[in-house]
Amino acid sequence: MLSSCGIALEDKPRNLSAELPDTLIEGAITTTEAPSILETVQIFLAKDSEEGSMFLETVEREIEPDGSVKPILEQILNGPTADEQERGLVSPFAEGSSLVGTTLEGSTLLVHLDTLDGFPTDDSASNQLAFAMLVCTSTELLTGIEIKQVLVLLERDDQTTAVNAPVSDGEPPADGEAVRCSNYITYMQD
């Protein structure tokens, strides 16, 4: 017994008069892009206190995670958003420094920069604050990883040089040694 679905057979194909969606037209190119998954992270930015001194304040940012801490630390170098600036948040960083990458050795995070051009150029409170933002974000706010200290390195001409980070508290580290958030207690709120 033969049965059919009720559509008559035709001897040859014919053109359809209905308008087809672009994706069904011959030769159409479709692109489907997976929606980006954002992750909320915290970083430290600087804020002026009522007494005129600066302190670190936690802010949240949305990033596209890549499995490393690099996109988080890049948010610090990017400085405050317009909304954050309206709330009084500032950054001592100027344009000029780029994060090359990060490496974890034990509990020490190695932060590789291409230059210090974006950092304040002296041993001032602004320079200390810049390092405090990087170091304390790394040791206090990054989740899922234990970082106790940070060593900032410069990558130039295929050479790596440790940066002597200026500190606000405690003994200055020996040349090329890592620093901890406890070296920047002055900038932490009670």
Regions found by a protein language model. Name each.
Residues 1-190:
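Bimodal "functional hotspot" detector
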